Amino acid sequence: MAHPLEGIIREAYAAFGRGDVDGYLKVCTPNFVFNVPGRSAISATYHGKEGVYALAGKAMEITAGTFHEDVEDVLANNRHAVVLARHSFTRDGLAKDYRTAHVYAIQDGRLAECWEQPQDPAVFEDAWGPGL
């Protein structure tokens, strides 16, 4: 039987995919943190609502609005959740595609912190381009 958070997280990702960042944030704690590894153009630690909006804005700017996320699976329990996803977009006229895992810490039934874990860090870095 699926954990109730699995459906809630799927709905949050669907909201994000529609451009409804607040719909995603509804399942996050107020002090939510999203960690993006590496040295790419989006690599940083993003804090709170403003941080998530900054990350989404950066992703849309770099991809000229072509960013697309397919959720392949969601696993969850009362302490952790993992979203397996495939990201695809166009950057500078080139198609980019990679798989990643979003590993979440759960606090009081809400997403408290996320660590992006690309399947292949080199492909991830190439997809997003160099940071400044």
What does each model-identified segment do?
Residues 69-74, 86-88, 99-105, 115:
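Hydrophobic/aromatic beta-strand elements that line small-molecule binding cavities or substrate pockets
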Residues 22-25, 29-79:
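A solvent-exposed, acidic/Ser-Thr-rich amphipathic alpha-helical stretch
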Residues 1-30, 130-132:
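Short, low-complexity N-terminal intrinsically disordered segments enriched in polar/charged residues
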